[in-house]
Swiss-Prot record:
Catalytic activity: tRNA(Gln) + L-glutamine + ATP = L-glutaminyl-tRNA(Gln) + AMP + diphosphate
Primary localization class, coarse: cytoplasm
Binding site for ATP: 35-37, 41-47, 232, 262-263
Residues binding L-glutamine: 68, 213
Gene3D superfamilies registered for this protein in UniProt: Glutamyl-trna Synthetase, Domain 2 (1.10.1160.10), Glutamyl-tRNA Synthetase, Domain 3 (3.90.800.10), HUPs (3.40.50.620), Ribosomal Protein L25, Chain P (2.40.240.10)
Motif placement: 'HIGH' region: 34-44
Cellular location(s): Cytoplasm
Motif ('KMSKS' region): 269-273
Name of the protein this chain belongs to: Glutamine--tRNA ligase
Gene Ontology biological process terms from the UniProt entry: glutaminyl-tRNA aminoacylation; glutamyl-tRNA aminoacylation
The EC number(s) this enzyme carries: 6.1.1.18
Family, similarity comment: Belongs to the class-I aminoacyl-tRNA synthetase family.
Amino acid sequence: MTQVDTAPSNFIRNIIDSDLQSGKHQVIHTRFPPEPNGYLHIGHAKSICLNFGLAEDYPNALCNLRFDDTNPVKEDADYVAAIEKDVRWLGFKWAGDIHYSSDYFEQLYDFAIELIKKDKAYVCALDAQQTREYRGSLMTVGKDSPFRNRPISESLDLFARMRAGEFAEGSMMLRAKIDMASPNMKMRDPVLYRIRFAHHHQTGDKWCIYPMYDFTHCISDALEGITHSLCTLEFEDHRPLYDWVLANISIACKPRQIEFSRLNLQYTLTSKRKLHTLIEEKIISAWDDPRMPTISGMRRRGYPAASIREFCKRIGVTKQENTVELASLEACVRENLEANAPRAMAVIDPVKVIISNYDENKTEKLIAAIHPKDESMGTRTVTFSREIFIDRADFREEANKKYKRLVLGKEVRLRNAYVIKADQVIKNDAGEITEIHCSYDPETLGNNPTDGRKVKGVIHWVSAVENQAAEFRIYEPLFLVENPAAAENIDEVLNPNALVIKHGFVESGLSDALAEKAYQFEREGYFCADNKDSSPERLVFNRTVALRDSWGG
């Protein structure tokens, strides 16, 4: 059975299968074509997994990584490097070298001249406001530009002079000559080239005219031999222009554009423009902030690459627009970490426990499983001592029977250690508990109490003598509403508790936790060492997801 046989079926795969069976194509060639004007986000992950996944599944198939870099004003080499890094981290390899649309600028220019010579394009001198007015609306047809029927020779001359830098930005543009009465606004003599005196990260200052996306994209696909050009549904009304350009130039390859629904995720914003604003207003620290929906942000937060790929596989590929529950993504992350993350103990909101009947000069090295369901991971050693820390939420002076943790006058088991009983509390002047004095049953290490009494609760702990101080960053969704994109004012729907920072302790064995190393902190959640701020001298752990789904109400 081949990978194609086991891959989930969808309408795009059905089209590809039909094209292969009919002999229309012998080899499938796709591409992932981001614009380098920001970081990739979870929405891009769906396209990455689709395009590169097809190349992995079909025999001899290829997938290019191409940067659609036609707007030097917004693009940057740093974004190029970040995108490359994200695609690699997700586990994909592109065919051959990286491609850039700017690699084809000379050929694109020649194709533009061909259109002019065929009287399919003309140089227009309308300004931006006039162009909008002449275009009309969905309710009214447009009207021809006064420059639409200028002589071919004149347009050729002006276009050459545009390239030579003789005209100011906004004073001239090259437009396709299609149909100003078309019901599709994209076909009303769209702009093919505009003047931009801007430094380009690939071509430097060689060019001062730059092709528009709709002109560049289809030709780049054709030049690279792309068979199936896959894009999201907002490009559906661009397809007639895609086909028109290729039909009117001398190029053999005619890729087929196919649209699929974009990924919309609850409580998540994927507009690059709005994400830029969050950074500019210092609401978010950077593109890789763990609260961001970017691939690098999710990586820093601790999402495994495999869990993102699995999520994209589960949501599938359709033409139906919908919004996916954030819980679905978190479930994929949780399943991966449950199976693979080593266990450790961490106390995030510590209060000291003193075990009065334990020798103050004694410590014990206790053995604990690294993973309770995977013996192959082995064991770890944890230090037990007279003074330990427990989480403040794991103690109450009074509680009902449902509270299965430590209560004054009652017993609880310490994970991987002994049964203890709370005998006394010490408080400061503000009435806050500073110490809990307990006694332990020395016969209960790995055993139930010998007299048959039942101890139901189990809590985690960390030695107060051997530990590592740590900062814990507890993350929640950045927005309070399911659809933040619909909010008139983003500031009003920001979650003030999207990041809560706490300070506590972890087992001493975590002092050398590597960047992005994932752990299940028992009874607390899944965490990873921050890939920017954590070091042996200052441990910083990001909470990736809670232990359980909290979205069910």
